[in-house]
Amino acid sequence: MLCMMAVVSIKAAEQPNVKLTVGNNAVQVQIDGRPFTTYHFVGEAASPFVRPYFYPILAADGTPLTSDQMITNPKEHPHHRSMWVGMGSVNGLDHWSFQQKPAPPPQRHVRFESVGADSLVEDLVWEDLAAKPLLTEKRTIGFLAYPDGSRSIDLTIALTAAGQDVTLGDTKEAGLCAIRVSSQISRKPTLMNSRGGKGEKQVWGKPADWVDESGTIDGKPFGVAIFDAPTNLRYPTPWHAREYGLLAPNEFGLHVFDPKLPGGAGDMKIANGRTITFRYRAVFHPGDAAAANIDQKYGAFVKGLDK
């Protein structure tokens, strides 16, 4: 049975002109009359589909800021489909990666509960290999823009155990708000976090409010950041963040990130019928983290959580 828990969208002070066009397979998103992203919620026959994803994600000037590896380099992390929600161990089943055989368990779109001026509320089911529900999800997606040309996607993810207890397992392969940045950005990247960590050794597996990766695309500076909400369990989250371009908050991989902890230390159990909720914001910005005032944007994000 689908969880009907009310979820409040994360709002910001900015009120861009957002237009959502819902089709049979995807939602087209425009900001101020220019394309921002496409949210693919149902697969098409020509492309393998396991879970919904956002692609492309464009800067205000039209520059693509993310990579869909299924299209650009399917031999390397084909499950990195620009921006997606994934979890590598759901009662032991892999809802993160992609393999041809056996077919991976899907996240299945059920319906859009509502479509607003700048947001969507979507019902989904995370299934097992027999197409039985493990989790129901209510996913709230919000879109906004900043005066400096940055654009953002908000995710509120409410997961409910459906018919049995569900354990989200201690694994490296997880990110309820995961992004693969453009390969141009990751050629000479600056990867950093809110605590002053720079480079993969100081960012991967380390707790932080936010992580940002920036670089250049065709000679122009751009970056991508993800914000973790203080309301999330295990805040501030450790991060599965790599200089090759992956950004993902990972509240679950505690033993993976710190082998001194016992195996399974990061397991998170959801009792049958219970719900846990996570909130994130992804910011797609011109310039590096400092130029984009990511710290200030994070502060505004936190203040907006109660609105």
Task: State where each predicted segment sits.
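Bacterial N-terminal signal peptides
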Residues: 1-7
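Sec/Tat signal peptide C-region and signal peptidase I cleavage site
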Residues: 8-12
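Beta-strand-rich N-terminal accessory domains
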Residues: 13-77, 156, 230, 289, ...
